[in-house]
Every structure is written in structure tokens, then in C-alpha cells.
Amino acid sequence: MPMGSLQPLATLYLLGMLVASCLGRLSWYDPDFQARLTRSNSKCQGQLEVYLKDGWHMVCSQSWGRSSKQWEDPSQASKVCQRLNCGVPLSLGPFLVTYTPQSSIICYGQLGSFSNCSHSRNDMCHSLGLTCLEPQKTTPPTTRPPPTTTPEPTAPPRLQLVAQSGGQHCAGVVEFYSGSLGGTISYEAQDKTQDLENFLCNNLQCGSFLKHLPETEAGRAQDPGEPREHQPLPIQWKIQNSSCTSLEHCFRKIKPQKSGRVLALLCSGFQPKVQSRLVGGSSICEGTVEVRQGAQWAALCDSSSARSSLRWEEVCREQQCGSVNSYRVLDAGDPTSRGLFCPHQKLSQCHELWERNSYCKKVFVTCQDPNPAGLAAGTVASIILALVLLVVLLVVCGPLAYKKLVKKFRQKKQRQWIGPTGMNQNMSFHRNHTATVRSHAENPTASHVDNEYSQPPRNSHLSAYPALEGALHRSSMQPDNSSDSDYDLHGAQRL
């Protein structure tokens, strides 16, 4: 290939490296990729958030051309679980309880690629959820003094829980291995083995014993596609000492059996746990309790085993809220109301939920909100707009209204003038301040013809009051003032 054709290729390669370095973490397979799981009480399950160059972003489940309800093969997110120090991925799909305190993004291209992402509206984004297996808690091995004699080389006794197809971690049939011999353990319902079961769950690093699983028969039919190594072994052991403190003293070997009930336990460390949420309230810390069964959410029905607040305290903690403030049972007036039922006191003890097809009484729980909601942006904008309109209204209409009020007030204080009010009256007078105004009932014909003048007549060389001068002249000729008028004609003076 000529050297001239290599230069454009080298330029494109360098440009691609520059774009990749600007975008930062392009895929969850990159060694420096950062991710976290939020909105749950475990670091190994929750809402997937990734860190790009400008901060943390919630990943929408519609990314990479998927629908908001599509579930993916969880093994594709194994690198994310490894970076979170969790076990294998159990589920990858819509988280359903969407909480978006920060920005959300939709990405395109191959699954797990973040080189082509765009910001999405929070109300259009459904969060992507990931559930990984919880890591096993390791305990330091007990130190024992070295044996005086060299034992026969053999594997130490050990236990294993075999879950049924689609089962849970820390739940299943107990298998015991001693040396080269391994098998299941025979179990009878009348056996008093509470201490033994707690010892077994603790030895399996699965917490404490919760319950026996429903009757499980050894040698059950193999499910299609299930590997043979996941099938329970035949019965080889029987309980010997229910108070044992070491595995080699707990069981004794018996003749192999192909059928019979075997020991199957459910321990408190089972995974995945029941997920809950609060809906229909004013915030994520208030509402009706719903639980998840597979990919579906349904109302949690009230039960007699949950009369205390322990269950609701656990629900509030899962929502990352404070302690429970109150809870009340809603009346199930509809006989067709359906939901899910947990027979245990706490939801963390329920490895399966039962259906209730009628008279499901929902529970409304109110938790303490660590971040109470303030005024919404729309409310603040409305208040500001109303204040602006009020100021504009005062600026435009205020001066005009003020002038009208001042004018009206001044008119009331101005002097009132009385002019001719009848056909035979040709005089106008100043009203005497000492005269008593008669009622309108005595002079109804003049009650509506009073004249008001804003200013008195200006002085001139001509008489401004000829009628008044005539009246004065007549009054001098007729000294008796027998008129019923309210005006003092004797006291009138020429202006």
C-alpha cells in the first residue's frame, strides 16, 4: 500500500481516539467504567446509574433500541456486577420504581455502549434495573492445633444448597459431602432439628434458618435443559445429632434411597429479596404499598401477621425514607380487589408471595421524608408572573385612579353656589353658613335643582349680582322679612 494512502487512515484513527477520549467511558466493558445501583437497600440491586464526563446519569431502559418493558439476558451485565463486588447478575430490565433526582440518558448502539447517548426528559424515561447476587460473607477459619498424626488425605466435609430451576440463592435441597461420598439428607417432619438447621444455614453463609421448603422428593424428574450436576443426589445420609457443632458429627451414612423426603431449607440470606414501593402519595415516602412478583407489581394485602410496625419500617428503609409515621388499612369494599399476600411479619422473610383474588385490603403507609418537597418550579413561576402583572397594573392604572380620587375629594370640599331654581326666581345667593337647611320634605320641588359651581364669579366693573341688589333694594322698602327662605337677606352685602 502506498504511503500516501496511509496518511488519511492514520488521521482518521487519531481522530477516533480523540473522540473516544472526549466521551470518556464508552462501554461497561471498559476497565475504568464507573456504575452504581441506587434506590434499594443493597449495593447489588437497584436503579442503574453511570458516571460520564459531566456527572452521574440514570440509564433509561429504552436505551439501545429496547422497549421500556423488555428484559435482557443478565449475563451481559456481568462486568458491572463484578465492579460492584457482587455475584453473578440475576436480572436486567425495567426497574419500574423510577426516581430521577439527576439527569437521565438514552444510549444507542450495542448493549452496554455509552459512546452515543443523549439526555432524556425525566417523565419519558423508565429506569433500567439490575439485580446481582449478594456477595457471600466470609468468616475467618477457626484455628485448630495441628493433629498429632497425619490424617488420611481426604476432602473436608462440606455442604451445598441446590436450588430448583428458577430458584433462589440460599434456598434449596441440602447436599452433604464427606470424602468421596455425597448425597441428600433424609428428613422426617417429626424431627426436632431447629438447632441443626440454624447451624447448617450459618455454615452455608446464608444467615439463619427461616423455614422448611415444601415437600421435596429425591430423584425428581429432570427439567428439560437443566444440567445434570444441578439435580439433587440420591439420599445417602440421615440426621444423627441435631445439636452437633461440626459437620462430621451431624449425619450418618445410610443405604442409598431413590425416593423419600429430603432436607430442604430456606435461609434468611436468600436472594433476590421482595421489592416494594409506595404509590398514590404526594412523594416517594407516602402511598399504598405494592410489591413485585416477577415482572409485575401488585398491591400488598394486609395480614394478621403484620400488625406491628416492623414490616412498614422495613418498607420505609427500602424507599430510603425515615421511620414510619403512620399506616392504615384501607377498606376493601370491592369483592374483586386483588393483590399479593405475605404470611411472614417482614417482607425480607418472604421468599414467595401468595395471590389473594378477593377482598384485598390495601395498606397506606406514610414515612418521614428526608427531603420534603418545596415549591415546584411551576408554582414559583406563577407567583412571579402574578407579581409582575400586579406591578404593571399599578403603573398603568394607578396614576389615573389617583387623579380621579383626588378630583372627587376636592369637589366635595369646594364651595357650593345656589343659582335660580324656579321660573319666578331671578336671584342667586351665597348660602348663609348659619342658616339651617330645611329638609327636602318641606321643599320637594327644589331638592333636585341645586346648582354647584367650582369657582365663584370673578369681580368686574359691572355688578356680578344684579338680582341680589334688587332684593336688597326691595328689602329696604319692606323691612319685615316674613319669607320662609333660609337665606338672610338683611345680612347680604354687595360684593
From Swiss-Prot:
This is T-cell surface glycoprotein CD5. SMART domains: SR (SM00202). Lymphoid-specific receptor expressed by all T-cells and in a subset of B-cells known as B1a cells. Plays a role in the regulation of TCR and BCR signaling, thymocyte selection, T-cell effector differentiation and immune tolerance. Acts by interacting with several ligands expressed on B-cells such as CD5L or CD72 and thereby plays an important role in contact-mediated, T-dependent B-cell activation and in the maintenance of regulatory T and B-cell homeostasis. GO terms for molecular function: signaling receptor activity. The modification Phosphotyrosine is found at Y453. It comes from Homo sapiens (Human). It is found in: Cell membrane. Glycans are attached at N116, N241. The keyword Cell membrane applies. Residues 25-372 are extracellular. Residues 403-495 are cytoplasmic. Residues 142-155 have a biased composition (Pro residues).
